A protein has these predicted regions:
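Bacterial Sec-dependent N-terminal signal peptides
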Residues: 1-23, 237-239
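Extracytoplasmic Ser/Thr/Pro-rich, glycosylation-prone low-complexity segments
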Residues: 19-240, 412-413
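Proline/serine/threonine-rich low-complexity linkers at boundaries of modular beta-sandwich domains
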Residues: 234-243, 443-451
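Short, solvent-exposed loop/linker segments at the N-terminal edge
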Residues: 251-258, 461-465
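Enriched for extracellular/lumenal, surface-exposed ectodomains of secreted and cell-surface proteins
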Residues: 282, 320-337, 575-577
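Intrinsically disordered, low-complexity Pro/Gly/Ser/Thr-rich segments with frequent PxxP/GP/PP motifs
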Residues: 285-314, 528-529
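Local sequence-structure signature of Cys/Sec-based thiol-disulfide redox active-site neighborhoods
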Residues: 350-387, 392
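Short, conserved sequence motifs used for protein processing/export or organelle targeting and
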Residues: 385-582
Length: 582
C-alpha cells in the first residue's frame, strides 16, 4: 500500500510539472518593458545606435542566419543559446528548422510554425526599407536582447502599411516580451495588419494572446511611451493575483482638499476577481480599508477602484502614501509583491500660480528648428502671461549658430541635450516641439503649484552696457530645503536679426546673451517659509560687438558681445534645484 501511495504522489508531481506553460500579462500604452529601451521606435542600424542588421528586403519568406543570445537564457525551462528569425514575423529557438516560413498568420498552436517559437506572425519583408535587427540593452545581469521587425510590410497591402514590433528576451527572469511599437499608413488604402501573438512550445502547446490570429495594431506615434507589450512568464499562473498598477495620488496636494484615493488594478490571476479589499496608509499609520464587491475582473482585465474614505491631510509637509489591495475573492493574494504602490508627496498650505520656464535649444542652421519655434509660439500665444522663455542658440548642426557661446554649451551639457530643437520645460528632459509638446502638456505643467514668489523689483540699463537688477524670493512653504537650490538669472535679447544662416528663419526671439553671474546661478541657503530674501545682480557687457563667422568662431564673453540693441534686452529669473533640475 505504501509503494502504491508513493507511486501515486509521483504521478501527481509529474502531472504538476507537465502542467507548466507560458501565461501572459498585457500592458497597453505602457511604454517598453523595464524602461531599458528609450529609443525612438524607428531606430535601426541606418540611424545608428548599435543595432545589428540580420536581414533586409526579401521577396519571399525566409529565415535569417542563427544568432547567439548574449546571455544565459531558458525557454520553457530549458537552456537555449541561439535563435533565428523569420521575415513572416516570428523567432524560433529551433535553429535546425528548415521548412520555408509561410506568411500566415494562423491560430496557435499551428503545425506551420516551428517548435519553440515566439510569434508576431503576419508580416513580410517585401518593402525596400523592411528588415530585422538586434540590439542588447542594459547591464550584465539585467540585460534585454531585442529582435526588432523593422518597417515590416503587411501581406496583401505592399506599399501602404508597415509595422514596427519586437521580441524581447530578458536576462535573469527568462521572461519573453512581445512589444508592438509603431504602425504606419501611406494612404487611405491602408489595411490593418493582423497578427498571431504568442508563444508556441510545440504543435500542440501554445500560449496565445486573446484575439489571435486577428489582432490588429492601432496607429501610434514612433515614441516608446504609447507602446503595447505582452509579458510571457513560464510557470503555473497564480489563481488569485490582483496587481496594483497605479494610483491617483498627486505629487502635490492642498491640505484643505480631501482626496478620494483610486487605484488601477489588473487581474493577473487565472480566476475572475469578484471582490477584494482596497487599502491605504499615510506615513506608516493604521490602514484605512474599504471592501470592493460586484467586480467581474477577468484575466488581464483592468479596472479603476475607488476607496470610500477620502484622505484629508492633518498637516502640511512631506507625506508617504501607500496604496494596496488584499484578499481577492476572500483569499490570500498569491503574488503579494505586486499588490502595493507608494508615493512621497508634498502637502501644502499655500501656493502661487506657476509660470512655466521654457529653455529652448535651437540653431539657425537647424531646418526643423524653424517649424519647432513656430509650434512653440502658437502655444505661448494661446497662454499669455503664464510662461518665461530663454533660447540657447547651439553650435550644430553644420557650422552652427554664430550666437553660440560657451555658456550655451554648459547649459546643453547640464540638460544632456544631444539634438535640436529641444525644449526643456521646468527642468524636465528636452522634447522636440515638432509634435513632442502640446497645449495639454503645457497646461499640465502650469497646473503644478509653485511654493515661492519670485519678483524682479528693478531692472536698469546704463548707457555703458551695465544691467542692474534686484530680485526677491519669498518662500511660501518649507519646501526648498537643502543646498541644491539656485537662483538662475539671464539677460536675453528680445529679437535678433544678424545670426541668420540656412534654416529660413530671419529673426530670433529671447536669445540668451549672458547668464548672471554664470550658468551655475547663485547658491541659495536658509530659505524659510514666509521670509523674503533679496538679491542684487549685475553684469556689464563689453562695448565691442562682433558677429562670428561660425559657432566655432564664437565670441570671447570677457571682451566681446553679440548684443544687437541694448534697449531690447530683458531679464529672466527662475528657481532651480541643481540635483533634480526642477
Amino acid at each position: 500500500m505504501l509503494k502504491k501511495l508513493l507511486f501515486g504522489s509521483a504521478l501527481l508531481l509529474t502531472a504538476g510539472l507537465q502542467a507548466q506553460s507560458y501565461y501572459y500579462i498585457s500592458s497597453m500604452r505602457a511604454g517598453n518593458p523595464g524602461g531599458l529601451n528609450t529609443e525612438n521606435d524607428q531606430q535601426s542600424d541606418a540611424s545608428g545606435g548599435g543595432w545589428t542588421k540580420l536581414i533586409g528586403q526579401a521577396a519571399n519568406p525566409v529565415y535569417t542566419n542563427k544568432v547567439a543570445i548574449p546571455f544565459a537564457f531558458e525557454f520553457a525551462g530549458n537552456a537555449v543559446t541561439h535563435l533565428k528569425a523569420a521575415t513572416s514575423g516570428y523567432i524560433t529557438f529551433d535553429t535546425g528548422a528548415t521548412a520555408t516560413p509561410i506568411t500566415g498568420p494562423a491560430a496557435l498552436p499551428s503545425a506551420s510554425l516551428p517548435d519553440r517559437s515566439v510569434s508576431i506572425w503576419g508580416m513580410s519583408a517585401s518593402g525596400s526599407n523592411d528588415g530585422i535587427f538586434t540590439k542588447t540593452f542594459g547591464t550584465a545581469g539585467k540585460r534585454q536582447f531585442w529582435i526588432k521587425f523593422f518597417s515590416m510590410s503587411t501581406p496583401g497591402d505592399a506599399g501602404n502599411s508597415w509595422t514596427y514590433a519586437s521580441v524581447v528576451l530578458e536576462e535573469g527572469t527568462n521572461n519573453i516580451y512581445i512589444v508592438i511599437q509603431n504602425c504606419l499608413q501611406a494612404n487611405n488604402a491602408y489595411v490593418s495588419p493582423k497578427h498571431a501573438l504568442g508563444i508556441q512550445i510545440n504543435s500542440s502547446t501554445a500560449s496565445s494572446v486573446k484575439g489571435s490570429p486577428n489582432i490588429t495594431n492601432q496607429l501610434s506615434d514612433a515614441v516608446p511611451e504609447d507602446n503595447d507589450f505582452y509579458q510571457f512568464i513560464y510557470g503555473n499562473q497564480p489563481t488569485r493575483d490582483a496587481a496594483v498598477l497605479s494610483h491617483n495620488v498627486p505629487n502635490y496636494l492642498s491640505r484643505t482638499a480631501p482626496l478620494t484615493i483610486k487605484a488601477r488594478v489588473r487581474n493577473q490571476g487565472s480566476a475572475e476577481i469578484n471582490n477584494l479589499t482596497l487599502n491605504y496608509s499615510i506615513n506608516g499609520g493604521a490602514p484605512v480599508t474599504a471592501s470592493v464587491s460586484g467586480l467581474t475582473l477577468g484575466n488581464n482585465d483592468i479596472n479603476e477602484l475607488t476607496h470610500t474614505t477620502p484622505w484629508l491631510p492633518a498637516a502640511s509637509g512631506w507625506a508617504n502614501v501607500m496604496v494596496w489591495t488584499s484578499n481577492p475573492n476572500g483569499g490570500a493574494d498569491e503574488t503579494p509583491a505586486n499588490d502595493t504602490v507608494k508615493a512621497r508627496i508634498y502637502v501644502y498650505d499655500s501656493a502661487a500660480p506657476r509660470k512655466v520656464m521654457h529653455e529652448v535649444f535651437s540653431s539657425s542652421t537647424c531646418p526643423p528648428c524653424r517649424p519647432g519655434n513656430v509650434a512653440l509660439a502658437a502655444i505661448f500665444d494661446a497662454r499669455p502671461g503664464t510662461h518665461c522663455i530663454l533660447k540657447y542658440q547651439c553650435d550644430f548642426p553644420g557650422t552652427g549658430d554664430p550666437y553660440y557661446t560657451t555658456e550655451v554649451g554648459t547649459k546643453r551639457s547640464f540638460y544632456a541635450v544631444n539634438s535640436v530643437p529641444a525644449t526643456v520645460r521646468d527642468g524636465l528632459p528636452g522634447v522636440n516641439p515638432n509634435g513632442g509638446y502640446s497645449i495639454d502638456d503645457y497646461d499640465g505643467l502650469q497646473a503644478k503649484p509653485s511654493f515661492a514668489r519670485l519678483k524682479i523689483n528693478t531692472a536698469q540699463l546704463s548707457w555703458k552696457g551695465k544691467v542692474d537688477f534686484n530680485v526677491t524670493i519669498t518662500p511660501l512653504e518649507d519646501y526648498m530645503t537643502g543646498s541644491n537650490w539656485r537662483l538662475m538669472a539671464a539677460i536675453s535679447e528680445k529679437t535678433t536679426f544678424r545670426n541668420v544662416e540656412t534654416n529660413g528663419e530671419t529673426e530670433f526671439h529671447h536669445v540668451m546673451k549672458k547668464m548672471v553671474p554664470s550658468p551655475n546661478g547663485t547658491v541659495l541657503s536658509n530659505l524659510q517659509k514666509g521670509v523674503p530674501q533679496s538679491f542684487d545682480l549685475s553684469y556689464t557687457f563689453p562695448d565691442k560687438y562682433r558677429l562670428p563667422n561660425t559657432s566655432a568662431d564664437r565670441i570671447n564673453l570677457a571682451t566681446e558681445t553679440t548684443v544687437e540693441d541694448f534697449w531690447d534686452l530683458e531679464v529672466v529669473v527662475f528657481l532651480q534645484n541643481n540635483a533634480t533640475k526642477e
